[in-house]
């Protein structure tokens, strides 16, 4: 790996295009280095993972709305929309599928200087691959690039400290991945990356206060923008440049300003793209930084029960990282995170609610743990409001560690009972993390798929999909990666414009 310094340049500066970060990513995208077998296998795992969470969300209202919007754009040679037959304009197919993947906050993650869900790259690449009749091998190569670009951006450039949403790293990564998939030249990829970033620099209000369904639509929109950017670039049009480093560019006015230098790691030419291997999926449907606390709560439940049960708890303090405290903890100062009437999207960003329910139930369910009946249970509300988070410098240091063996996304829970008894335990990483108690392997991804698809995807369709996806390196018909279900029970929606 090499480190590329990224900072603002005046328009009058001699700043060669070859030094632009967007150009560096275009070089990465066109590097013909082979995808390693373990990366190829992990890409298959993540396609299975996305299908699993899409099956669980396919009938929900936001996903139904996005699907109906896509259905307004049929195309003879297009992309497939999860759940239904037919072909649709690829940018709209990607949009619908992106919402389905993101709706339940239940797929993969990478956390470093910024947050990300790199599996959001898969819907736009798959939709375009289907429309272009690309091969499974081409899709694998494109996804490897997209993950690599997103992982390196997340390592090098923090967005949230300036209240910019993390989809600003998704537009460029999806555009770069599309470049690899489509075998286009560096100049085209460079221009597509510029437009994709320019159109996806949204604020983090989508994840603040009363969180709406736009949290699921936001990455889908970024994927759609990446496809449109690539289409326009392929037709010979240019984009704002240098998009990161320009005098009026992203760094100068949206991020740390004209005097700041970002350090973005990049693979050397010919170095395999291994970024996906440093990402991790979720066992539980909730914000990633709550994964380890959920497992910790489940582990602590027998001790709490032996001490009298949750009704005898006086206080719970979760000592954790800066990110966890300020994004999903009491450091956010969001009263909505303590509100029993809050939206599901808000509750899955409240570690106080999540820890309370996991401690009481000993399990976490992608639907039942979020019902209004569950969130308004009096004893749950009482416990929930006894929980607070505290930033611990050691947890913050471990969160940002460059050593995978030391990097941690968990917390230490200090539970004080009414009689003064103190119960303490901590967990650094979730059980499903590569270094966790039960690291996810292929069989776990398949089990997650079967569990979430049960009652929604018929058994024969499950088997057909699993056979196709596990044959991806040799698969010529990528339409086989779509899954059809009975959508007659889809959520009711209002009429729109499209």
From Swiss-Prot:
Gene behind the chain: prpD1
Q: Which organism is it from?
A: Corynebacterium glutamicum (strain ATCC 13032 / DSM 20300 / JCM 1318 / BCRC 11384 / CCUG 27702 / LMG 3730 / NBRC 12168 / NCIMB 10025 / NRRL B-2784 / 534)
Q: Which Pfam families match?
A: MmgE_PrpD_C, MmgE_PrpD_N
Q: Which reaction does it catalyse?
A: (2S,3S)-2-methylcitrate = 2-methyl-cis-aconitate + H2O
Q: What is the annotated quaternary arrangement, including any partners?
A: Monomer.
Q: What class of enzyme is it?
A: lyase
EC numbers, comma separated: 4.2.1.79
List, alphabetically, the Gene3D superfamilies matched. Answer: 2-methylcitrate dehydratase PrpD
- Give the highest taxon in the source lineage: Bacteria
Molecular function (GO) terms listed?
A: 2-methylcitrate dehydratase activity
The UniProt family comment states: Belongs to the PrpD family.
InterPro entries this protein is in? 2-Methylcitrate_Dehydratase, MmgE/PrpD_sf, MmgE/PrpD_sf_1, MmgE/PrpD_sf_2, MmgE_PrpD, MmgE_PrpD_C, MmgE_PrpD_N
Taxonomy of origin reads: Bacteria, Bacillati, Actinomycetota, Actinomycetes, Mycobacteriales
**Described purpose of this protein according to its UniProt entry:** Catalyzes the dehydration of 2-methylcitrate (2-MC) to yield the cis isomer 2-methyl-aconitate.
Name of the protein in question: 2-methylcitrate dehydratase 1
Supply any other comment: The prpD1B1C1 operon seems not to be involved in propionate degradation.
Q: Which keywords does the record carry?
A: Lyase
């Amino acid at each position: 790996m090499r480190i590329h310094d990224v900072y603002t340049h005046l328009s009058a500066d001699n700043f060669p295009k070859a030094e632009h970060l967007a150009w560096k990513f275009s070089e990465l995208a066109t590097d013909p280095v082979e995808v390693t077998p373990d990366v190829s296998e992990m890409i298959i795992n993540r396609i299975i993972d996305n299908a699993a969470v899409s099956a669980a969300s396919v009938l929900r209202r936001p996903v139904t709305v996005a699907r109906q919007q896509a259905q307004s754009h049929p195309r003879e040679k297009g992309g497939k929309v999860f759940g239904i037959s037919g072909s649709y304009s690829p940018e709209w197919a990607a949009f619908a599928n992106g919402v389905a993947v993101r709706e339940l906050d239940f797929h993969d993650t990478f956390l470093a200087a910024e947050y990300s869900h790199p599996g959001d790259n898969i819907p736009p690449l798959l939709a375009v691959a289907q429309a272009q009749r690309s091969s499974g091998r081409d899709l694998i190569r494109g996804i490897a690039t997209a993950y690599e670009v997103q992982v390196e951006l997340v390592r090098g450039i923090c967005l949230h400290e300036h209240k910019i949403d993390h989809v600003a790293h998704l537009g460029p990564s999806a555009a770069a991945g599309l470049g690899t998939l489509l075998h286009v030249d560096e100049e085209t990829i460079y221009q597509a990356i510029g437009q994709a970033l320019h159109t996806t620099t949204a604020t983090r209000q989508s994840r603040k206060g009363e969180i709406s369904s736009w949290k699921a639509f936001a990455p889908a929109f970024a994927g759609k923008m990446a496809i449109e950017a690539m289409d326009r670039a392929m037709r010979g049009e240019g984009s704002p440049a240098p998009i990161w480093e320009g005098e009026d560019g992203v760094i100068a006015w949206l991020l740390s300003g004209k005097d700041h230098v970002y350090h973005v790691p990049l693979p050397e030419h010919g170095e395999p793209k291994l970024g996906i291997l440093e990402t991790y999926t979720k066992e539980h449907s909730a914000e990633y930084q709550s994964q380890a606390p959920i497992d910790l709560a489940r582990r602590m439940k027998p001790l709490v029960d032996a001490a009298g049960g949750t009704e005898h708890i006086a206080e719970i303090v979760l000592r954790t990282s800066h990110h966890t405290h300020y994004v999903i903890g009491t450091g956010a100062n969001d009263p909505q995170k303590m509100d029993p009437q809050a939206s599901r999207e808000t509750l899955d960003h409240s570690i106080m609610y999540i820890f309370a329910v996991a401690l009481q139930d000993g399990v976490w369910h992608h639907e039942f743990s979020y019902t209004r009946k569950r969130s308004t249970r009096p004893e749950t509300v009482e416990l929930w409001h006894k929980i607070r988070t505290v930033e611990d410098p050691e947890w913050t240091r471990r969160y940002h560690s460059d050593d995978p063996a030391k990097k941690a996304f968990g917390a230490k829970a200090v539970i004080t009972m009414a009689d003064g008894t103190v119960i303490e335990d901590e967990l650094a990483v979730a059980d499903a993390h590569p270094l966790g108690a039960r690291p996810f392997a292929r069989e776990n991804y398949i089990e997650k798929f079967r569990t979430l698809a049960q009652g929604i995807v018929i058994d024969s369709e499950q088997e057909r999909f699993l056979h196709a996806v596990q044959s991806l390196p040799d698969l010529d018909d990528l339409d086989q990666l779509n899954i059809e279900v009975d959508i007659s029970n889809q959520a009711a929606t209002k009429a729109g414009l499209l």
